[in-house]
Amino acid sequence: GPAGVTAAKLRELGVIRGKIATIFHGIDISSREVLNHYTPEYQQLFRRGDLMLPISNLWAGRLQKMGCPREKIAVSRMGVDMTRFSPRPVKAPATPLEIISVARLTEKKGLHVAIEACRQLKEQGVAFRYRILGIGPWERRLRTLIEQYQLEDVIEMPGFKPSHEVKAMLDDADVFLLPSVTGADGDMEGIPVALMEAMAVGIPVVSTLHSGIPELVEADKSGWLVPE
């Protein structure tokens, strides 16, 4: 979104030429802070820009409600490199159950919810191991929660891993977990690419009825979705 605003201004100044297509992904069309700052400029972009490319039907509808002409909107889905995330051989669930999340460690990824769920699983005597791959501003908060619930023996946070290591860990996993939620400032997902990669590999996914996720995961058929 904001990049399109900048491009439109540069074209108006004669710095660049050509048509302007603007992608709307997630935070740029959901965060109250971003919208409070950019909504007036988005209105100008809707008039002056050539094409708006929201990554979900949900965002397409929101753009229309914000005043963008329908004829300037085309949903442009994100994709996955299938040469890197090819289907793995079918595997039976392991004991303990291997659960994995790959995400930037922010509020909207809902990993605090995942850790709470792990606390309940451990109390119920379920044998599992949970890996959270990624870095981000919520790392300290999540580690503190793990310590508070005494889950250090079942939850591992190895940080950032290169894509080939992520793929190897996905191949070993039994469940991909991403309980996305709406952040306190309204920040929402678009459609998480990490979910697409897990599905491309062939891992059962568990996520939430959040933003564009139901456009990717067909509930009870290609994965399990629960309310935020």
Predicted regions and their residues:
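Nucleotide-activated donor-binding/catalytic signature segment of Leloir-type glycosyltransferases, i.e.
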Residues: 141-164
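Carbohydrate-associated surface elements
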Residues: 58, 79
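Conserved donor-binding/catalytic core segment of Leloir-type glycosyltransferases
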Residues: 53, 91-109, 115-118, 131
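Short alpha-helical donor nucleotide-sugar binding micro-motif in glycosyltransferases
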Residues: 160-161, 168-173
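A short, histidine- and acid-enriched strand-loop-helix "catalytic/donor-clamping" loop
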Residues: 2-5, 13, 18-36, 48-51
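Acidic donor-binding loop of glycosyltransferase active sites
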Residues: 171-187, 203
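Short hydrophobic beta-strand element within catalytic cores of glycosyltransferases
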Residues: 195, 200, 204-207, 217, ...
